[in-house]
Amino acid sequence: MAEPGTGSGDPAFGPGASESGTRRLSDLRVIDLRAELKKRNLDTGGNKSVLMERLRKAFKEEGQEPEEVGISWGAVSKRAVKRNTKGSKMEEEGSEDNGLEEDSRYGQDGVVILQSSQDRDTMDTGVPDGMEAEDLSVPCLGKADTVNQILHAFDDSKEYVAAQLGQLPAQLLKHAVDEEVFKNTLEASVSDLKVTLADEEAPMEPENEKILDILGETCKSEPVKEEGSELEQPFAQATSSVGPDRKLAEEEDLFESCGHPEEEEEEEEEDQEEEQEEEGDLALASSSKSESPSTRCQWSEADAPLAVVKRELADAPGGGGGTRHRRKRKRRRKHQAQAEALGTGGGAGMNCEPVGLEEPVEQSSTAAQLPEATSQELVRAPTAALSPEPQDSKEDVKKFAFDACNDVPAPPKESSASEGADQKMSSVKEEQDIKPVIKDEKGRASCSSGRNLWVSGLSSSTRAADLKSLFSKHGKVIGAKVVTNARSPGARCYGFVTMSTSDEATKCISHLHRTELHGRMISVEKAKNEPSEKKSSDRRACDQKEKVPGPDRPHPVKIKTEKTVIKKEEKLERKEEKGPEDIKKEKDQDELTPGAAGHSRVTKSGSRGMERTVVMDKSKGEPVISVKATSRSKDRSSKSQDRKSEGREKRDILSFDKIKEQRERERQRQREREIRETERRREREQREREQRLDAFQERREKARLQRERMQLQCQRQRLERERLERERLERERMRVERERRKEQQRIMREREELRRQQEQLRAEQERRALRRPYDLDARRDDGYWPEGKRAALEDRYRDFPRPDHRFHDFDHRDRGHYQEHVIDRRDGSRTRVEERDGQYYPDDQHSHGRLLEHHAWDSGDGWHGYSSDKKLNEGQGLPPPPRVSREWAEHSSQLEEQQVPVWHSAVDTNMTGHEHIRWRGAERGLAGGPGHGHVAAGRGGMAGQGSFAHGGHSQGYIVPSGRLEGGGMASQDQGGRVPNPHPHPHFTRRY
């Protein structure tokens, strides 16, 4: 490769510049820009403008003018240019969209192309980039200028190409067919892949495990030789112009599809179909090695069944990723165009492929079986796609493709002499290796029967790398993966480890069973479902079937019988039912082609391989070891159709009667189940109804009790209020009673006091009978006299005869009796005085002398008003009767019959204040004047009981009380007295 910055190394200044031509920087495509940047060890990522700017800077650093530098570009054939121009737009677009093809470009050898594909494989499958140096340990082939010279001299004619290939450098021819170096490289690549596989993420581990299984078993297989058949020749003629670099690109695509089968199978199929259409126009002859023409033939044949199966899988829901597919298809077309342009790399490019190649002497393989397998798989492809475990069909197809890739077939008879010689050698070698291959397959199948280990009880955080590192302590680990139950993710984790030998597997069980990993106790045991054993039996059946079509093979009957036995064993494993219409369809499909055994092989191996899908096998009651390679939607869509394919495989077991009987039993069980379910539902509804009724009754009873409780509470409150009211009334009554008793007691005390005062008063009156002087000025203070009193005429009382017999019979001994009689009489007449004065006392205490107690005789104040003028003015009672009243006592008893009822009203003066003042004035008048002889001399007054009225004049006339207005005292000789027709106005009572 040219050194950057050197003029001699630059293609623009090399010796072939004139032949190849140059282009300016602005005319370069993205891939050319990246090639120039790669030469200078610069970054090749980014779009076209970024790449162009980066290259300009590189030219400026080299001291060149970017716009004036002419960049050489290899002269490819017209047809190749036509094809590249046809896809140039898609190439540039893919280059801008995806930076993964940064190492692939024109003008470089096949090693770089292989590195590009290997890098893409590394990125797609999750293998670390550190693998690249180990995997690509094949020496670099040739210099860039040598390759450019060969490309410049390339011509359309096969002879010219053969002549040019004869002139290849020794370095290219040295590595073209180096058997030992290639085998060592292949072993190193396989071991590196195995070691690095455990570091992948969990979703990528199943696919990589497939790759390891394929590499570990296929690369060591020795495929038998197969003579070129009539079916091979047309394909070989149509594709003989394809170089080995095209094969490298296709093998690279196959390697990618192994890494991501669910995403890239469809795009690979479409790419191969497009390539087959375009290969008719590509007449590039490359016959450096015998593998080149037959490789294209084999791929043309092998892609057809892949196309059918992958299209079926891609049509399933969830098999999308169309944008990614388109980008990868663009990238693949570009690499294939580069491989065609660099076809002179020949065997060198083939040797640079680390995997998928076999010993050159043994590379005449089974291309003749491929057309037959194609026809069989075209018929069987829908069944394979709809099998109960659809991912296994893809796995088997990938194995088939790898077999076809590794076992490079012999060229057609039109090839050169060297090709014919190689064909003969491979034929002889193949015949010698038939029996060793069969024995090797059987030995490997028996050897691998016990090397699969099932690890249970793993922690959810356990990864495949942990299992790989743990089990590698006790032997060589072929593959390790962690599987889970897809129907309940995260529930439990299991591990599936494949050891290199069964002895190592047994050793791992003895050392690792019931040990701790990540805090969980793990159990290691032999896998019950042996996918590797079934795969080996499938592969053995495949190899034996490939021997059948040769006309000189003595084994077809034996192999077919063996395959029939395998088929029946697989059918017996299925427990599902199959309808009669499925059987008819299968019979029709079986009649379409005589090679039904071949396509049934694909289907059965596919259905077996799907045991590695992450599911739980309900019929077996254990986890089924599987690989989750597609989305769940695709799994569901495939599982929804698996009963058809399973039914087709059981056409030799169940008859119509058995099917009907089985379906009838199933329907009967279904009916019984429905009846039981209905009965249970009815009982449940009845219980629920009863519970609802009970709840309703309970609620109603509770409401009734609540209402009654409220009523009782209201009654209790009402009774409490009534009780409180009664208590209040009782307390009020008792209070009134206490007050009444107190009042009665007070009244009794007052009566006693009054009686005592009366007794004291009588005793005092008896003790002293004082004559009080006439107080003239006291009359002025009387407020009851509104005007001055007129002087009475002296002849006022002249006409009143004065009875002389009133005091004749007075007896002093009756004075006490007279006093008591006067008091009783005054008490009896008090009611009339009160009625006359307008004073009404409803209480009975005022009707029996109580007026006297309150007014006249209260507290002894009634009779001491005479003592002074002040007391007279205050009006605190009547003055006591004069001592002369004793003289009236005896005479009063004689006058009692002669008194009229008006006397009491006229004389009763103990309640009004002006009455006793008048009587007092009368006393003064009576006492002051000279009275007649019958009045006691010196006593000066009248009786306190008011027997005589006040005269009102100073002459001292004694006016008898009977002559007063309003009634008075009538004498015993009434008829002899004449009343005064003109009474004195002072004696007229004013009420």
From Swiss-Prot:
It comes from the Eukaryota. The modification N-acetylalanine is found at residue 2. GO terms for biological process: regulation of androgen receptor signaling pathway; Sertoli cell differentiation. InterPro entries: Nucleotide-bd_a/b_plait_sf, RBD_domain_sf, RRM_dom, SAF_Modulators, SAFB1_2_RBD, SAP_dom, SAP_dom_sf. There is a cross-link at residue 60 (Glycyl lysine isopeptide (Lys-Gly) (interchain with G-Cter in SUMO1)). Residues 451-529 form the RRM domain. Residues 323-336 have a biased composition (Basic residues). There is a cross-link at residues 225, 310 (Glycyl lysine isopeptide (Lys-Gly) (interchain with G-Cter in SUMO)). Transmembrane segments: none annotated. One of its GO terms (molecular function) is identical protein binding. A motif (Nuclear localization signal) lies at residues 755-772. Residues 25-59 form the SAP domain. Residues 1-26, 60-134, 200-444, 520-696, 963-991 are annotated as: Disordered. The modification N6-acetyllysine is found at residue 658. Interacts with SAFB/SAFB1 and SCAM1. Interacts with SRPK1 and inhibits its activity. This is Scaffold attachment factor B2. It comes from Mus musculus. The lineage of its organism: Eukaryota, Metazoa, Chordata, Craniata, Vertebrata.
